[in-house]
């Protein structure tokens, strides 16, 4: 498998030589730690070599340099992932020396390729320009609040997995190709809010647009460009092999094509892999047998090897980094919308059989990734 992946990478070297991406673009290895505050409130503790540790400091000490955090508009079903909770997460990340990425969901709940529900507070707004202003003002006010706390993020995601049209009514949700006249107006409003605030304060913030799975990004960014959505800095991708048409060795093809076409660096802003198929609580796990790839068993070593392989491929293709989704979402007594416990403890970086002791997956942060892998 190693030779196969390296050979595929070598073929791409000529193609990625002229991506238009600056040579000084940083390469991030990070984690989405949005769940940590809630997990600790629910009684979770985290350990490294048997000793209790602060999870943010642990990730920083292990080499993580970027923390991603989601923000919901007004989630009445939980007290987490609101501005107060997000501010706490950003502060903990910055105090540990890591940079931050703020992920605006523009919803009161989860957004993803299947749903992009408008916040209840905006549901009455039918005029696109008026809705765009509400989005602009909310984005600006959020950044201003964080800035006052000296918590302004380094990167901002304008939407989360926006494969379908954003800010849709739940009872009239439309999948498939977005209404680009409306969608472009709304997305550009969010982008403009970030740009204007950055310009006003003189504080740089990179804009990320985020699509789930590389095969969707190829058509989405083409249509976005055709409809005037062009002012962004980073192409963000979710990459989960279970749900992608692209196998791991094929991923650099998509990264190279996106970077060659749009001259923007590509970052994997979500990925994950199970270290076991065992379920430790009543909440069903999202990543089960179908998530397991032949080359990477569902084991601590398999999880690490997947991450090392993925990150090397992204680096070799000229990508900007890899962020692991919710490696600290461990099992607790608390409930989600769907069950009691965690739906992700078998894909976390902590061993549920050893009181949440750190797993080998942490080694992926400090691995020596080469900018250009050579075929063997």
Curated annotation (Swiss-Prot):
The signal sequence is 1-17
Binding of Ca(2+), residues: 281, 285
Coiled coil region boundaries: none
This protein is called what? Arabinogalactan endo-beta-1,4-galactanase
Signal found in the keyword field? yes
**Known SUPFAM superfamilies for this protein?**
(Trans)glycosidases
With respect to pH, the record says: Optimum pH is 7.5.
Cofactor names from the entry are:
Ca(2+)
Name the source's superkingdom. Answer: Bacteria
Question: What Enzyme Commission number does this protein have?
Answer: 3.2.1.89
The similarity annotation says:
Belongs to the glycosyl hydrolase 53 family.
GO MF terms, alphabetically ordered: arabinogalactan endo-1,4-beta-galactosidase activity; glucosidase activity; metal ion binding
UniProt keyword terms in alphabetical order: Calcium, Glycosidase, Hydrolase, Metal-binding, Signal
What up-regulates or down-regulates this gene? By galactan.
Recorded name of the encoding gene: ganB
GO biological process terms, alphabetically, are:
pectin catabolic process
Provide the active-site residues from the annotation.
161 (proton donor), 270 (nucleophile)
Q: How is the cofactor bound?
A: Binds 1 Ca(2+) ion per subunit.
């Amino acid at each position: 498998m190693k030779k196969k992946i390296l050979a595929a990478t070598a073929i791409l070297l000529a193609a990625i030589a002229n991506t238009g991406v600056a040579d000084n673009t940083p390469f991030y290895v990070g984690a989405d730690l949005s769940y940590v505050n809630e997990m600790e409130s629910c009684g979770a503790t985290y350990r490294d070599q048997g000793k209790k540790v602060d999870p943010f400091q642990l990730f920083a000490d292990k080499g993580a340099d970027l923390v991603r955090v989601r923000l919901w508009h007004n989630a009445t079903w939980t007290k987490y992932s609101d501005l107060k909770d997000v501010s706490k997460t950003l502060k903990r990340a910055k105090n540990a020396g890591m940079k931050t990425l703020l992920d605006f969901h523009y919803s009161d709940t989860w957004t993803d390729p299947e749903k992009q529900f408008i916040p209840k507070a905006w549901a009455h707004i039918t005029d696109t320009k008026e809705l765009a202003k509400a989005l602009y003002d909310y984005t600006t006010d959020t950044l201003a609040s964080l800035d006052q706390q000296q918590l302004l993020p380094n990167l901002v995601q304008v939407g989360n997995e926006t494969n379908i049209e954003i800010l849709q009514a739940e009872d009239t949700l439309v999948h498939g190709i977005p209404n680009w006249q409306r969608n472009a107006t709304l997305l550009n409003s969010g982008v403009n809010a970030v740009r204007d605030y950055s310009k006003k304060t003189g504080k740089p913030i990179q804009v990320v647009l985020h699509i789930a799975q590389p095969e969707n990004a190829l058509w989405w960014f083409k249509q976005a460009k055709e409809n005037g959505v062009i002012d962004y800095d980073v192409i963000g991708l979710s990459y989960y092999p279970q749900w992608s048409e692209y196998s791991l060795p094929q991923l650099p093809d998509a990264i190279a094509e996106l970077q060659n076409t749009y001259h923007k660096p590509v970052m994997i802003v979500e990925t994950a892999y199970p270290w076991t198929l065992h379920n430790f609580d009543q909440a069903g796990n999202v990543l089960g047998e179908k998530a397991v790839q032949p080359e990477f068993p569902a084991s601590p070593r398999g999880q690490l090897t997947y991450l090392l392989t993925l990150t090397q491929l992204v680096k070799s293709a000229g990508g900007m980094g890899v962020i692991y989704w919710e490696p600290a979402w461990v099992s607790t007594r608390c409930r989600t919308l769907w069950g009691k416990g965690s739906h992700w403890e078998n894909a976390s970086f902590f061993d549920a059989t050893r009181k949440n002791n750190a797993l080998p997956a942490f080694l992926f942060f400090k691995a020596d990734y080469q900018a250009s892998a050579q075929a063997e």
